[in-house]
């Protein structure tokens, strides 16, 4: 993905909006297909009427990590257990939705 330049260099700036497939797989082998939307960050920053940027994306410095961002949570019930703590959904870290 093309990275932005200047002040937005920590974000992606693809020439056209992208809809990328992703797959989440749990330790129990359960999996879920998801979609990641990526759009031109600089263009989104220039639209001040938007308070949430659902297609904002950028690298976070580790190929083993991914930040889904706030839009992933819209319309979902998401449950989390803190690392080392036990709950009805297991010993953390656990993410369920």
Across the structure, where does each feature detected by a protein language model lie?
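Short conserved beta-strand and strand-loop elements enriched in small hydrophobics
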Residues: 18-29
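Aspartyl protease active-site motif detector
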Residues: 1-12, 69
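Short coil-to-beta strand junction motifs in C2/discoidin
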Residues: 13-17
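Aspartic protease catalytic domain
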Residues: 29-97
């Amino acid at each position: 993905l093309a990275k932005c330049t200047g002040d937005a260099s920590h974000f992606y700036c693809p020439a056209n909006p992208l809809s990328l497939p992703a797959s989440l797989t749990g330790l129990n082998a359960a999996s879920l297909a998801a979609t990641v939307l990526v759009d031109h960050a600089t263009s989104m920053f220039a639209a001040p009427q938007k308070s949430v940027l659902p297609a904002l994306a950028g690298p976070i410095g580790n190929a083993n990590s991914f930040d889904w961002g706030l839009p992933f949570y819209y319309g979902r019930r998401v449950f989390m257990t803190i690392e080392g703590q036990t709950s009805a959904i297991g010993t953390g870290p656990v993410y369920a939705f």
